[in-house]
From Swiss-Prot:
It catalyses: (S)-dihydroorotate + H2O = N-carbamoyl-L-aspartate + H(+). This is Dihydroorotase. InterPro entries: Amidohydro-rel (IPR006680), DHOase (IPR004722), DHOase/Allantoinase_Hydrolase (IPR050138), Dihydroorotase_CS (IPR002195), Metal-dep_hydrolase_composite (IPR011059), Metal_Hydrolase (IPR032466). Catalyzes the reversible cyclization of carbamoyl aspartate to dihydroorotate. SUPFAM superfamilies: Composite domain of metallo-dependent hydrolases, Metallo-dependent hydrolases. Its cofactor is Zn(2+). It is an enzyme of class 3 (hydrolase). Pathway: Pyrimidine metabolism; UMP biosynthesis via de novo pathway; (S)-dihydroorotate from bicarbonate: step 3/3. Its EC number is 3.5.2.3. Belongs to the metallo-dependent hydrolases superfamily. DHOase family. Class I DHOase subfamily. The keyword Cytoplasm does not apply. Zn(2+) 2 binds at D170, H197, H251.
Length: 443
């Protein structure tokens, strides 16, 4: 297998035309599913259809890509990644993280602000944007911090003007309810999501894995499931009387939290949530096998919780899938459970793990792809994740039925902390296109 990457930088040349022929073209939003061809010019999708190029590709096309046996679909959108820049470049950088994203078919990511220093000022926001323009393979968006040192609100309006698509203190929760209430009021004024790492630290402090049979068997302090659902319930109460507010829950993991979200949605509240592939594929049981490699926050929970996540994806209570891509070097993970860092990498496994729900007949393909493309894009109000005329040409070419084994040593990410090594999956990214430009391909 030969893999090739290209930096995005300015994107495709303005008038450069690419014809994608013999493709199965899927757009989850419009329920489009056809056999046909698609034409891009520069950064845009110009045309597509079953009869396009039926008389052959015209001479004015610069490049023709035969997609026989492959699915051409919107580029994936991951609204929860940690690229560790600035401050922890030994774990990941925008360059290596975006390379990992491209290999996973992800064309847009949202970087979390818990870097060193944190993205809590306009200067740091501008620095991040500059680094992204210089070194990224994919579109880089970012959340800015809700608070400065967890004590007071950041300059939320100025940070939005500087490019922030939302606000979070991810890695830790906003514990102070008055500060959270103020942030939610800004959400209403500025039309941005306030994204909460839902965890009451009074119920979780010092915990390493889910509180339950595995934590008891291993003799380590557990993280109570209620630490998440209590915070979710608190925040829903804080936002319920604010008009035009958007509250988003990061990496939801417990059945009780999901029940609270469903109740809020039934009341018409603008509450959205994301789930990671590891929370709908794995349980706390694998900690016995993988140790600290399977340590993340929120932790892997029970089979009942896992099944609730799958059901939430089926019913639409869960709005999207996101990785919480959290790279760590070996020295951060080769430690006892209590001392090791939280988190796993996920960009290169998100698509095949999500497709397990399709291949097993649990969830419709349109529904899975929707939660990987336009639905996360809509949460952050970014016009991505669609195959439609005159839309930006962010595309992923996938062999839907290709069977392969996950090999973590081959990841493009600088870090290899994943419990999925050796897992057999179906669905492989063949090519990733951002703004009409191929940024990743493999043969």
């Amino acid at each position: 297998m030969t893999q090739t990457w290209n930096l995005l930088q300015a994107g495709q040349e303005r008038n450069y035309k690419v014809a994608y022929i013999n493709a199965r073209i899927i757009d989850p939003e419009t329920k489009l599913d056809i056999e046909g061809s698609l034409l891009t010019e520069g950064s845009k999708i110009i045309d597509f259809g079953e009869s396009l190029f039926s008389n052959g590709v015209p001479s004015g096309v610069d490049e023709t890509i035969n997609c026989e046996g492959l699915v051409l679909m919107p580029g994936l959108v991951d609204i929860h990644v940690h690229f560790r820049e600035p401050g922890q470049e030994h774990k990941e950088t925008i360059y290596t993280g975006s390379k990992s994203a491209a290999a996973g078919g992800v064309t847009t990511v949202v970087c979390q602000p818990n870097t060193t220093p944190a993205i809590d000022s306009v200067i740091l926001a501008k620095y991040l944007k500059y680094r992204a323009l210089e070194t990224s393979h994919v579109n880089i968006e970012f959340y800015a911090k809700i608070t400065t040192s967890e004590e007071k609100l950041t300059e939320v309006a100025l940070l939005k003007e500087a490019g922030a698509v939302g606000f979070t203190d991810d890695g830790i929760p906003v514990m102070n309810p008055m500060i959270m209430r103020q942030a939610l009021l800004y959400s209403s004024m500025l039309n941005v999501p306030i994204a909460q790492h839902a965890e009451d630290l009074n119920l979780s402090a010092g915990g390493a894995i889910n509180e339950g049979k595995i934590s008891e068997a291993l003799g380590v302090k557990g993280i109570l499931s209620a630490s998440e659902s209590v915070m979710v319930s608190r925040d829903i109460l804080l936002m319920k009387d604010i008009e035009n507010v958007h509250y988003h829950i990061l990496h939801i993991s417990s059945k009780d939290s999901l029940d609270a979200v469903k109740r809020a949605k039934d009341l018409g509240l603008n509450v959205t949530c994301e789930v990671t592939p590891h929370h709908f594929t794995l349980t706390e049981d694998i900690v016995k096998q993988h140790g600290a490699i399977a340590k993340m926050n929120p932790p892997l929970r029970t089979e009942e919780d896992r099944l609730a996540m799958v059901e939430g994806l089926k019913t639409g209570v869960i709005d999207c899938i996101a990785t919480d891509h959290a790279p760590h070097d070996r020295s951060s993970k080769d430690l006892p459970l209590e001392s090791a860092a939280f988190g796993i990498v996920g960009l290169e496994t998100m698509l095949p793990l999500s497709l397990e729900l399709y291949h097993s007949g649990q969830i419709d393909l349109f529904d899975i792809l929707a939660k990987l493309t336009y639905k996360p894009a809509d949460i952050i109000h970014v016009p991505r994740g669609r195959v439609q005329k005159n839309f930006v040409a962010d595309l992923t070419l996938v062999d839907l039925n290709y069977e392969w084994e996950i090999k973590i040593d081959s990841f493009a990410s600088k870090s290899k902390n994943s419990p999925f090594g050796g897992r057999k999956v179906k669905g492989r990214v063949v090519r990733t296109i951002v703004s009409g430009k191929t940024v990743y391909s493999q043969k």
